[in-house]
Amino acid sequence: MAAGEARATSFGQVADDYNRVRPGPPDEALDWLVPRNCQVAVDIAAGTGLFTRALRRRVAQVIAVEPDERMRAVLAARSPGVRAVAGRGEALPVPDASADGVFVSSAWHWLDPGRAVPEIARVLRDGGRLGVIWTSRDRRVGWVAELDMLRRPQAVRSAEDARSQLRRRHDVTLPAAPPFENIATASFAFVRTMTVDDAVDWLATYSGLITAPAGERAAGLARAREALLRRATADGVIEIPMQSTCWRADRVHRPASGPPR
């Protein structure tokens, strides 16, 4: 198995912790991303359903597409009213022109846009919304970016390197002549309050650490814990600056006749 594929499929090993400590999106980001008239939504690479459940509070019908059966099992158990199905963004098990919105939360970098974008266009109704969101630590803050250096010193050389990696990950690249218009971006800052123990558990749910050798993983998490404790309160609580980066576009209307393009 290639290294990229091993990392992409590693999250099921920590599915319960992933669901417990990974952040969900802030309401302001959802207000911006999800159109008010969205009645049927597809969540690609839905994981354990953190974004799925936020969608379900706004949308009548949500189809969660997730390839990892371990992640999907947690999603199904925690997400009443959601249809959870096996599948990938490059081959969606969803009928043509059946969704008002297709969303990808913190997973666009795992997709092949050349194959996924035509699939998304296929399942969207005319005028339907493609929304992409990443909710993560705000690496614009120096000490937050430095956490990446501490937990993975071989992969990240500086705080600016951590920020550059994140910018590349947040780049939504569409194939030539995609059937989308009204492209827009926005970001939303907020603060997440949690214990240091939970923050360390959160860092441990990232693929680079899941797939790292045990000794390297333990050392990286120990360094991160030490840095977090320096900023925590006496009872071990820390406020972590967060950012939701959002991207959206609307599907152009299909020609009056002929197959969807």
Predicted feature descriptions by range:
Residues 90-101:
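A short acidic, Gly/Pro-enriched loop at the edge of an enzyme's catalytic core
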Residues 115, 121, 125-192:
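Conserved catalytic/acceptor-binding region of the Class I
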Residues 1-45:
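Conserved class I S-adenosyl-L-methionine
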Residues 100-114:
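A short SAM/SAH-binding and catalytic strip from SAM-dependent methyltransferases
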Residues 48-91:
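Class I SAM-dependent methyltransferase SAM/SAH-binding core
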Residues 40, 61, 129:
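Residues at the starts of beta-strands that form the adenosine-phosphate
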Residues 169-261:
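Conserved Class I S-adenosyl-L-methionine
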